[in-house]
Amino acid sequence: MRECISVHIGQAGIQVGNACWELYCLEHGIQPDGQVPGDKTAGHHDDAFSTFFSQTGAGKHVPRAIFVDLEPTVIDEVRTGTYRQLFHPEQLISGKEDAANNFARGHYTIGKEIVDLCLDRIRKLADNCTGLQGFLVFNAVGGGTGSGLGSLLLERLSVEYGKKSKLGFTVYPSPQVSTSVVEPYNSVLSTHSLLEHTDVSILLDNEAIYDICRRSLDIERPNYSNLNRLVSQVISSLTASLRFDGALNVDVNEFQTNLVPYPRIHFMLSSYAPVISSAKAFHEQLSVAEITSSAFEPASMMVKCDPRHGKYMACCLMYRGDVVPKDVNAAVATIKTKRTIQFVDWCPTGFKCGINYQAPTVVPGADLAKVQRAVCMISNSTSVVEVFSRINSKFDLMYAKRAFVHWYVGEGMEEGEFSEAREDLAALEKDYEEVAAEGGSDDGDEEEEY
């Protein structure tokens, strides 16, 4: 089987994780205590959920996941929440003191004490798999744990499971909304290792998702659980083809094959359609063509950047629900004729499509409407560079004065690491510029790293 292990790191990773596992359970008819009611199993394919859940002798389903945080409060919510019986207590790992928004604490001092325990738990999960396909890593790069411990774990996973693919779902700092002063430092230091140690990284940012909730779901003041439920739909759509059957199934390794033209250029935009409230859905018939074109709307992107400022290199459309290949081909043909959606000249085809017959599931009482069909788009666009240049310029403003640097050095980092990471990101910006440039002839940049 093609199992995936999910690793949720830090507050953002864990809270997105909660939303995801809640949704997976609903999709597979698994109750919060891990049992599947008897009558369900007859119709279900037994192996459908084994990519994400392992089964115990007693018929209980346990997520192949691990939750790590350096301080206990967020994980304690899982330990006492609705799904407390779903997870094995050993899968919930928490430390005593947090990383205090400091990459160096997460990566060197405090993270170092907990990382071996985490890897040990991951090893147990991996031994339980017959054909481990890869890891899904959830974290945010603005804080201390998600950035510091997140990159430490990724580095160690690369060493121990070198060939397995690693997909990152990474929350990046928003342009306007900031949760900490040192976000730019943490993000730059963390992206430095994301560049090396993830195969595909899907960028998210809270502000973009707030705007989607406000605009499309009419939520005046969205909170994190609104955001996370939207993100969980995207992640569920991506992994649906691992868990259900469909006309065109896409597995994790296919993402990187189809989306990553050069190893470093692996930061993706994501969007999801239709995002629509129950009040409106009743009155709208959303055709495949409509949801496809709304997935390409700049306003649908889950990270603040404008795809019209860049060019698409590749794009992956994952449909689910009542969709047939004929409609998909027609919708894609329409997209190709649009002038606003530009592809680089060296990648003329550029579309990877997946279809899954399982209709989207919604969490009862949540804001999203139940719809017949939905699409999730993951695209590799050169406009992602906006996200990095924004963070880089904020980093430069602070680093020019060496503001706050002593907190990092005091935790055993060297100042050289700052400039090294910053140079790496400058090189990344340059890479994106070159890829976007006309005439795709490169001077031997093509050695693959795999």
From Swiss-Prot:
Modification N6-acetyllysine, positions: K40
Descriptive protein name: Tubulin alpha-3 chain
Subcellular location: Cytoplasm, Cytoskeleton
E.C. number(s) listed in UniProt: 3.6.5.-
Principal location: cytoplasm
Residues involved in Mg(2+) binding: E71
Post-translation changes: Undergoes a tyrosination/detyrosination cycle, the cyclic removal and re-addition of a C-terminal tyrosine residue by the enzymes tubulin tyrosine carboxypeptidase (TTCP) and tubulin tyrosine ligase (TTL), respectively. Acetylation of alpha chains at Lys-40 stabilizes microtubules and affects affinity and processivity of microtubule motors. This modification has a role in multiple cellular functions, ranging from cell motility, cell cycle progression or cell differentiation to intracellular trafficking and signaling.
